[in-house]
């Protein structure tokens, strides 16, 4: 270890960092409050170790507009992080699931399926569009939305399914798997 701080700890030498890193690997896209609740570290301790893991290149962070989410470095590219960020939000996850299973749908169709107002669905769709996860195409007087890469969404959902807690979405993806 030449040219480095002799007091610096290697990235995963400390048990607490290994624990945090492993938890993020097992639950990619976890946000700070979820990590705080799951790992039961003091807030300052967790912040410190997350910063150290980022600085050492073990973790990356992604901002989804509401939360800062953490990912193992080099395991998720920016598109995968955007997909996982969406899958971590309940209504975005449900919208993505319907689009994955049913293909292109309008705001009204999604509103009916989700039991939410069209304005709420539209807001979530605009966030998905900003993240470049959906495309929209005008169909007469309505606009249909479609996943940009449904196979990638299905793959990421399938791999990380156990980290999501939404039985409705599980049933929709099970339906898709049955085709």
Annotated model-derived regions:
Residues 10-11, 24-28, 85-86, 99-102:
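Short helix-capping/hinge SLiMs at alpha-helix to coil transitions
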């Amino acid at each position: 270890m030449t040219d480095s701080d002799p007091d610096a700890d290697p990235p995963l030498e400390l048990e607490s960092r290994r624990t945090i890193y492993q938890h993020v690997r097992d639950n990619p896209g976890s946000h700070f409050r979820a990590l705080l609740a799951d790992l039961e570290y003091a807030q300052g301790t967790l912040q410190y170790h997350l910063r150290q893991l980022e600085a050492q290149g073990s973790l990356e962070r992604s901002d989804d507009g509401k939360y800062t989410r953490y990912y193992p470095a080099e395991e998720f590219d920016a598109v995968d992080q955007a997909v996982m960020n969406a899958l971590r939000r309940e209504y975005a996850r449900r919208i993505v699931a319907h689009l994955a299973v049913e293909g292109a749908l309008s705001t009204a169709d999604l509103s009916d399926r989700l039991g939410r107002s069209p304005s709420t669905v539209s807001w979530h769709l605009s966030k998905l569009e900003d993240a470049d996860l959906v495309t929209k195409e005008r169909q007469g007087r309505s606009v249909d939305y479609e996943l940009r890469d449904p196979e990638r969404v299905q793959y990421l959902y399938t791999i990380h399914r156990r980290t999501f807690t939404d039985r409705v979405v599980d049933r929709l993806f099970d339906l898709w798997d049955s085709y």
